[in-house]
Amino acid sequence: MIYDTDRDSLKKKFRIADKVIDYLNHDDNGLNIIIGSDGDPFASLVYRYLMKHAPNKGSVRYSIQTNGLLIKKMMLRFSNVFNNLQMLQVSIDGATKDTYEKIRLGGKWEKIKENMEHISKVKDQYHFLWHFDFVVQRDNFREIPMLLEWADRLGVDAVNLKPIEDWNTYTDIKQYQVWKKDHPDYDEYNSIMNSVKDHPKIAHRNFHWTLT
């Protein structure tokens, strides 16, 4: 859906988008539409088309999952969606420039900071919930306390801490699974997680995969 450039495939997806838009325009039962989860929707021609033509009405609410790099520019372009936004989830896997740009390839730390500051300023205008999604792994677990401090300052409603999963991206996923007891950084990781486990911003309190 996100990065498809094949002409025939795109035509098919635009037709599907048209059917979704038509359904949304005629439904008044109350719907929550999730936009994203398979890449950044603001980088997708199909998702942009869907958001451009999505209805601006109270019975249809939207939730967006994004990496946040394009969001400031897109908020005005798709005001019909943001006027009815229920939740904004931003994937942020680092709280410093070096870590963020190492993990989020192609990401620019200054741009994500600028965009998060913008959301912080306009969030109350749109009345949506704002979550950070943070995929915990070896290269970023030490920055969890910093991320929580940043979330507090910005007014983020919740921080979702999620373990890294094996998407066949790494040749040895075990070296990144810092929550496993046989990992060389486990003790340090466990100490950090215990220090933040009661933080009010942490949304998922099921830490069976994190704590002993």
Model-derived features: where do they sit?
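Radical SAM enzyme [4Fe-4S]-AdoMet core and its adjacent flexible, acidic
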Residues: 3-18, 26, 52, 59, ...
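Conserved alpha-helix/loop element of class I SAM-dependent methyltransferases that forms part
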Residues: 21
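LRR N-terminal entry segment and analogous cap-like coil->beta motifs
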Residues: 25-33
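Conserved LRR concave beta-strand detector
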Residues: 32, 61-63, 87
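Short beta->alpha connector loops
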Residues: 41-42, 67-71, 94, 137-140
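Acidic donor-diphosphate engagement hotspot in glycosyltransferases and nucleotidyltransferases
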Residues: 46-47, 74
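Conserved SAM-binding loop
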Residues: 47, 64, 69
